[in-house]
């Protein structure tokens, strides 16, 4: 296995491989999101309680799910980087951070828009909302800490430690509606129970969830290539690449 993986340890190989894979993931993401959002907005029936305001769910729920998923992936990468000193893991963590921050911001904004007609206010200091806001600040903190040091290795290590510590916030976000009496509704899709939403509403939601997953992979591959160029900016292969682009 290691013999097969060894050629991919080179940053130049990783750069070109990500370039080949990113259009594939991008195309799937666009297709899934286009079908899911159009289906959800135009063809899914109105909710019997919320009317048409529920349709923002097709952006809010996937963004909220993958705001946590991306952070969890960053934490795994940070652990790998700190334990086994694998530079690619540090670069992956940094590459994912802006994407996770973007998803978290989308989740917060769409949640506020959805909450206005439901709760009568744009924002309440609800347990889940507050924990999601903390998640956004964690993303910003990871990026800020990484950029705060002139030595990229020190910055990556410091940001990785913060990322790992911040993982404690993920179960708080997920279980807050069960642990405390909150305004936020419970999960519409559960692993062991029948979904609480109708199938015509559920199918486009699932498409959008997978669409956001492929979107996150696509953006991560693009961002990872950028981080590789920064890391190896003085290496011959990057200089050669720059000369070809001129």
Show where each model-derived region lies.
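Polytopic transmembrane helical bundles with strong interfacial aromatic enrichment
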Residues: 1-246
């Amino acid at each position: 296995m290691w013999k097969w993986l060894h050629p991919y340890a080179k940053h130049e190989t990783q750069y070109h491989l990500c370039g080949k894979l990113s259009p594939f993931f991008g195309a799937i993401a666009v297709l899934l999101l286009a079908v899911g959002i159009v289906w959800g907005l135009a063809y899914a029936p109105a909710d019997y309680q919320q009317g048409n305001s529920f349709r923002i769910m097709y952006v809010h729920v996937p963004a909220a799910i993958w705001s946590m998923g991306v952070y969890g992936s960053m934490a795994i990468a940070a652990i790998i980087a700190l334990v086994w000193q694998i530079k690619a893991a540090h670069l992956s963590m940094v590459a994912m951070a802006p994407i996770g921050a973007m998803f978290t911001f989308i989740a917060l904004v769409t949640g506020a828009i959805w909450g206005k007609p439901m709760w009568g206010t744009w924002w309440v200091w609800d347990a889940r909302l507050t924990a999601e806001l903390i998640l956004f600040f964690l993303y910003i903190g990871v990026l800020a800490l990484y950029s705060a040091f002139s030595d990229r290795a020190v910055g990556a290590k410091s940001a990785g430690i913060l990322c790992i510590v911040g993982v404690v916030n993920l179960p708080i976000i997920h279980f807050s509606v069960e642990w405390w009496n909150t305004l936020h509704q419970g999960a519409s899709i559960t692993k062991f129970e029948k979904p609480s939403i109708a199938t015509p509403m559920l199918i486009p939601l699932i498409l959008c969830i997978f669409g956001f997953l492929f979107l996150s992979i696509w953006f991560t591959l693009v961002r990872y290539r950028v981080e590789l160029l920064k890391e190896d900016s003085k290496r011959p292969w990057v200089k050669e690449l720059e000369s070809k682009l001129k």
